[in-house]
Amino acid sequence: MTNRFKVILLGILVGIVVLLANPAAANPSKQSIQSSIVKVMATHNHPDYQSPWQRKGINSVTGSGVIIGQQRILTNAHVVADQTLVEVQREGYGNTYTADVEFVCHSCDLAILTIDDESFFKDAVALEIDGLPELQSRVAVYGFPTGGETISITEGIVSRIEVDYYVHSSDRYLLAQVDAAINPGNSGGPVISNGKIVGIAMQALEQAENIGYIVPAPVINHFLDDVKDGQFDGFPELDIYVQLLENKALRQSLNLPKNSGGLLVTG
């Protein structure tokens, strides 16, 4: 029993030493997470596609972002689309910093910002990106929505995971639905589970309450892997049109089994 107790005790001590030597191995505290949340202030000058010789005029919006490492900030593409100036600010710091848009993917509504001044990142914790959250898993949405000046944290669960439309691009990608409140200004803010990023707040359903949508971690990781070589190539597309074989008469006309399903390639 004595030897066994010593082995168990030694294992506990080794585990403690590993955690102390590698703080990232432990989940970051709420305060550490808040240190990585960024308020994004963008000035836009959108083109007028009906009158292409002019623009719609300058307007300003605010969104959110998160520090992810390599002195980069991850946010939504629609927050910085057609920007003429992007500034960022951390809670508790009076200074604003000018940011550059390094990469942007309008189809999946993600963008990476960089800042030349390293002092912006002082004492900030770069958050890790996890995998696809499980259904019913609890998440927290961090950001700077309208209604106040400090960081807002709302909590909820992942209620649905499916392929659907991203409003910014009208393209269909994997997304997750959460019942945590997502309001204007939350766009680009991280969705956290167990101290890691599982998504980026993206859009909400206006006709309902507490139905928000996030860009899930697999889409984020695809985007980040794409730009590792210094250029953005985009998401591959299968250039075909399909129709669901739900109509009984259509299946019969194609001589398909009565209870079969599938897709019909139409173009």
Predicted regions and their residues:
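N-terminal activation segment of mature serine protease catalytic domains
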Residues: A24-N76, L85, E134, F223-D226, ...
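Bacterial N-terminal signal peptides
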Residues: L10-L19
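Conserved active-site neighborhood of the chymotrypsin/trypsin-like protease fold
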Residues: H46, G69-I151, P184, A208
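Active-site region of chymotrypsin-like
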Residues: S36-A42, D48-R55, D116-A126, S152-E209, ...
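C-terminal cap/linker of serine protease catalytic domains
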Residues: P28-S32, V40, D117, F121, ...
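Soluble non-cytosolic domains of exported or imported proteins
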Residues: T62, D130-E134, G148, S152, ...
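N-terminal secretory signal peptides that target proteins for export/translocation
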Residues: M1-F5
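Conserved hydrophobic positions within beta-strands
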Residues: G65-I67, A99-V101, V158, V265
